[in-house]
């Protein structure tokens, strides 16, 4: 990036001035080393700038990570309750803590892996639908939820896959509707 003169600093309102030497005590004429940096993300094509969507890789990482984290926390909570219920009358405090930690760790890992896989499948189906239709709306999420439920229960038979698909579609629709309600009525 070339250095800019002082005369054209106010010409573009979508930029900010940046001085790379502002934090250093160096004997350099700082006014000639002011650079105009954009304040918004840069895109090669204007169509990319109009889309407010994560890429398929970011989508995959986000949904899988969020699902794994949520499943691990929920599983650890259930594991704590299971560990507390498994106390015996002669257990020492050290043994009780050990039971709680073992139970919460095992259940947290199991739930995290299972729900993380569901997030992975959902993200893959949703990204595939968006790539095929070039649309991202409520129905994309509902169809992705339907497909995720069906894929995750396909090994148990057609009836189980159909029920799980319907539940997945309803769950995805409820989440999207809740997100829209929060955007509209909750001032953030």
From Swiss-Prot:
Source organism superkingdom: Eukaryota
Official protein name in the record: Mitochondrial import inner membrane translocase subunit TIM23-2
UniProt domain comment: The C-terminal part (143-188) is required for insertion in the mitochondrial inner membrane.
Tissue-specific expression: Expressed in roots and young cotyledons. Detected in leaves and flowers.
Protein family (similarity comment): Belongs to the Tim17/Tim22/Tim23 family.
GO cellular component: mitochondrial inner membrane; mitochondrion; TIM23 mitochondrial import inner membrane translocase complex
Keywords: Membrane, Mitochondrion, Mitochondrion inner membrane, Transmembrane, Transmembrane helix
Subunit structure: Homomultimer. Component of the TIM17:23 complex at least composed of TIM23, TIM17 and TIM50. The complex interacts with the TIM44 component of the PAM complex. Also part of the NADH-ubiquinone oxidoreductase complex I. Interacts with OEP163, TIM17-2, TIM21, TIM50 and MPPA2.
NCBIfam families: 3a0801s02tim23 (TIGR00983)
The protein's role, per its UniProt record: Essential component of the TIM17:23 complex, a complex that mediates the translocation of transit peptide-containing proteins across the mitochondrial inner membrane. Links the inner and outer membranes.
Compartments (UniProt record): Mitochondrion inner membrane
One GO molecular-function entry: protein transmembrane transporter activity
Transmembrane segment boundaries: 64-84, 112-131, 138-154, 161-178
Pfam family, one: Tim17
Topology term for the membrane: Multi-pass membrane protein
GO biological process terms, semicolon-separated: protein import into mitochondrial matrix
């Amino acid at each position: 990036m070339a250095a800019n003169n002082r005369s054209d600093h106010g010409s573009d309102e979508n930029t900010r001035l940046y001085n790379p030497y502002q934090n250093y005590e160096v004997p350099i004429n700082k006014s000639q080393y002011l650079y105009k940096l954009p304040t918004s993300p840069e895109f090669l094509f204007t169509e990319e700038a109009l889309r407010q969507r994560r890429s398929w890789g970011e989508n995959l990482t986000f949904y899988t990570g969020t699902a794994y984290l949520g499943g691990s926390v929920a599983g650890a909570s259930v594991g704590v309750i299971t560990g507390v219920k498994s106390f015996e009358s002669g257990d020492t405090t050290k043994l009780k803590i050990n039971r709680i930690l073992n139970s919460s760790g095992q259940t947290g890992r199991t739930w995290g892996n299972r729900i993380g896989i569901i997030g992975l499948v959902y993200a893959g189906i949703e990204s595939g639908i968006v790539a095929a239709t070039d649309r991202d709306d409520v129905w994309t999420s509902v169809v992705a939820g339907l497909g995720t439920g069906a894929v995750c229960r396909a090994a148990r038979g057609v009836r189980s896959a159909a029920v799980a698909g319907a539940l997945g579609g309803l769950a995805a629709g409820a989440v999207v509707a809740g997100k829209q309600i929060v955007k509209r009525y909750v001032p953030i």
